[in-house]
Amino acid sequence: MTKEQIIEAVKSMTVLELNDLVKAIEEEFGVTAAAPVAVAGGAGEAAAEQTEFDVVLASAGAQKIKVIKAVREITGLGLKEAKELVDNTPKAIKEGVTKEEAEEMKAKLEEVGAAVEVK
């Protein structure tokens, strides 16, 4: 079978048949059809394009009761759950929020004396 005959055979296949062919080739030769990922310079670009942020309570500070109230307001947790979260710092308060939401939460918590990190 020539290369041209193989190409013609592939052209006549359906998408499902092509998918099966790719899987069979991967199994037969121990390779994957995944595209290579560029590693160099990726970390700097990823940091610049970050769209989801985690708000982490680093410490409650001196005004623990006010921090618990703020945590309850932000998260909607009950009193017991909010107290446990504040007592077990550092702890993520909210994950996967926008930069604006994260900055707003950070400002509210720092206003009552908490130490907060946005990651």
Swiss-Prot record:
Give any Gene Ontology cellular component: cytosolic large ribosomal subunit
| Gene (UniProt) | rplL
What is the recorded function of this protein according to its Swiss-Prot or TrEMBL entry? Forms part of the ribosomal stalk which helps the ribosome interact with GTP-bound translation factors. Is thus essential for accurate translation.
A Pfam family (short name) is Ribosomal_L12
Q: Is Membrane included in the keywords of this UniProt record?
A: no
Q: Could you list this entry's UniProt keywords, alphabetically sorted.
A: Ribonucleoprotein, Ribosomal protein
Family that this chain belongs to: Belongs to the bacterial ribosomal protein bL12 family.
The UniProt GO MF terms for this protein read:
mRNA binding; structural constituent of ribosome
**Complex and partners:** Homodimer. Part of the ribosomal stalk of the 50S ribosomal subunit. Forms a multimeric L10(L12)X complex, where L10 forms an elongated spine to which 2 to 4 L12 dimers bind in a sequential fashion. Binds GTP-bound translation factors.
Please list the GO biological process terms of this entry: translation
Which top-rank group of organisms is this from? Bacteria
Q: Any idea what this protein is called?
A: Large ribosomal subunit protein bL12
